[in-house]
Amino acid sequence: MPCNRSRPSLYSLSYIKRGKTRNYLYPFWSPFAYYLYCYKYRITLREKMLPCCYKSITYKEQEDLTLRPHCCLPCSCLPCSCLQCSESLGGLQVGRSTAQEKDHSQLKELYSAGNLTVLSTDPLLHQDPVQLDFHFRLTPHSSAHWHGLLCDHRLFLDIPYQALDQGNRESLTATLEYVEEKTNVDSVFVNFQIDRKDRGALLRAFSYMGFEVVRPDHPALPPWDNVIFMVYPLERDLGHPGQ
């Protein structure tokens, strides 16, 4: 019997969820007591045709298009769009429930040596993207922060405000050394907004350090808009270091 039904229906809705969560590593009066987060979701209602042409079922797909790392409030309030959590980092493909978001909202100390402290939301063997925060102590009262996401042997780092300062360069060197020695990351990606005033200086500085510009349509990149990515490939032997 011929099928007279039209094509299956498809409806899609996107929305953004923003907020802040408590960082219990610091007292509530500390400027680092809270982290900002931003999630972008897409809900799809899809009608699926059954073998019988007169019946169909509708099921819901929920996809988390954008997972942005929690940025501490002092970083997000700096006068530079690249560090505002709501504008800078957006988008690794991952699905999470509300309960999982609560579990992942608290960063725990993963490593500490010298001036470098590494915080993580999940064990590094987890399959979903994991937030890694690198805090590098500059003075007794100040530190440089690199906020990033670890996903499938790739680490995505947000370039902090005044990244070309000497202290931030030292913090990046310490971060790269940790990533190479303590994780199974193959490539480190840094990103910054296209409209940054120091874009030219960032391109020159990171190129000098061994980073290369990545074309926007590269399959390894998340779908972030108006962002320039640069990659630093880590030279590995036959095996990856275990965590």
Curated annotation (Swiss-Prot):
| Identification of the protein by name | Ornithine decarboxylase antizyme 3
- Biological process according to GO: negative regulation of polyamine transmembrane transport; negative regulation of stress fiber assembly; polyamine biosynthetic process; polyamine metabolic process; positive regulation of intracellular protein transport; positive regulation of protein catabolic process; viral translational frameshifting
Keyword Ribonucleoprotein included in the entry's annotation:
no
Picking any one GO molecular function of the record gives: ankyrin repeat binding
Q: What's a GO cellular component annotated to this UniProt protein?
A: sperm flagellum
Q: Which Gene3D superfamilies match?
A: 3.40.630.60
Recorded hits in InterPro entries, A to Z, give: Acyl_CoA_acyltransferase, ODC_AZ, ODC_AZ_sf
Which keywords label this protein? Cytoplasm, Nucleus, Phosphoprotein, Polyamine biosynthesis
What does the subunit comment say? Interacts with ODC1 and thereby sterically blocks ODC homodimerization. Interacts with AZIN2; this interaction disrupts the interaction between the antizyme and ODC1. Interacts with GGN.
**Pfam families reported for this sequence:** ODC_AZ
What is the source species? Mus musculus (Mouse)
> What does the UniProt function comment say about this protein?
Ornithine decarboxylase (ODC) antizyme protein that negatively regulates ODC activity and intracellular polyamine biosynthesis and uptake in response to increased intracellular polyamine levels. Binds to ODC monomers, inhibiting the assembly of the functional ODC homodimers. Does not target the ODC monomers for degradation, which allows a protein synthesis-independent restoration of ODC activity. Stabilizes AZIN2 by interfering with its ubiquitination. Involved in the translocation of AZNI2 from ER-Golgi intermediate compartment (ERGIC) to the cytosol.
Q: In which tissues is it expressed?
A: Testis specific. Expressed throughout the differentiation process from spermatids to spermatozoa in the inner part of the seminiferous tubules.
From the broadest rank down, the organism's phylogenetic lineage runs: Eukaryota, Metazoa, Chordata, Craniata, Vertebrata
Keyword Phosphoprotein carried by entry: yes
Phosphoserine sites (modified residues): S6, S9, S12
User: What family name appears in the similarity comment?
Assistant: Belongs to the ODC antizyme family.
Reading the lineage from the top rank, the first entry is Eukaryota
Q: Subcellular location, in the record's words? A: Nucleus; Cytoplasm
